[in-house]
Amino acid sequence: TVNELSATWASAIVVEVETGRILAAAEAPTVDPNDPAAVPAADRGSRIFQAAFEPGSIMKAVSASMVLDTGTADEYDTVPAPDRMNLDFDDEYIKDSFSHEDFTLSLAGVLRYSSNTGMTNFASQIPRETRYEYLKKFGFGSVSPLRFEGESSGILHPASQWDEMTNLVTTFGQGISVTS
């Protein structure tokens, strides 16, 4: 529970997979609509619809679907997945969340190991504008059909505004934001 984990808040959503329809939503702390002043102002909205966050590794499944749908790779293709991938600009790098020897991974392997470098090597082969269009079709950067008062659309900048790092990190869930 929220109390057992000493969490500030929690949310849960039940979604119909085939349609994306929200069947149920719950969050804690809750607000008594008859006495909203009984809770701090920060807890009076709905974090499910208003609190934007980076999706992180769950985005790898979205990127993998783009890779397959565009024909960029199939289930047998592999890419290098080093522990750390140095980039050709600004002394930047992409790193996996755990130290490991260099891997050569299939798309399934990238998902299994949650490899940032592997997903970058797969999904960055897709032109950024194409990936942006897929993200829009998936609903990123948009409010839900519920049009909840004060709902955040999250952040999805147009592909033309992505710098080189954003172009890469969006493949594994950074550089964009979503709500629950």
Residue locations for each model-derived region?
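Beta-lactam-recognizing serine transpeptidase/beta-lactamase-like catalytic domain environment
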Residues: 10-55, 62-180
